From Swiss-Prot:
Annotated family: Belongs to the parvalbumin family.
A GO CC term attached to the entry: cytoplasm
SUPFAM superfamilies named among the record's database cross-references: EF-hand
Function: In muscle, parvalbumin is thought to be involved in relaxation after contraction. It binds two calcium ions.
This protein's name: Parvalbumin alpha
Chain positions with N-acetylthreonine modification: 1
Positions annotated to bind Ca(2+) 1: 53, 55, 57, 59, 61, 64
Pfam families tied to this protein: EF-hand_7
Organism of derivation: Latimeria chalumnae
Length: 111
């Protein structure tokens, strides 16, 4: 499995994480842009999804979403409950309370 820093620039990851280091400040639109995901090909987005899908279930569940920033770098903070729910709501198009790979790529593209 690749590391996030092999897919995206380390300085972009750091900048994005620093921008949202305050609890409650997370905005997935801005984050995906800052971190350099916007405009990346589907294959790259799928690799990123694979890193964030910690249990390799094919979905990012709410519990994993909480750690989404840590997926980009170990120093990332945990999302608050409200931030996690907002991200889930934004990404979950079919209402199954988790984000599949296609939902994830759509979420990034909509950012």
């Amino acid at each position: 499995t690749k590391k996030m820093s092999e897919i995206l620039k380390a300085e972009d990851i750091d900048k994005a994480l620093n921008t949202f280091k305050e609890a409650g400040s997370f905005d997935h639109h801005k984050f995906f842009n800052l971190v350099g995901l916007k405009g990346k090909p589907d294959d790259t987005l799928k690799e990123v999804f694979g890193i964030l899908d910690q249990d390799k279930s094919g979905y990012i569940e709410e519990e994993e979403l909480k750690f989404v920033l840590k997926g980009f770098a170990a120093g990332g903070r945990e999302l608050t409950a409200n931030e996690t729910k907002a991200l889930l709501k934004a990404g979950d198009q079919d209402g199954d309370d988790k984000i599949g790979v296609d939902e994830f790529t759509n979420l990034v593209k909509a950012a």
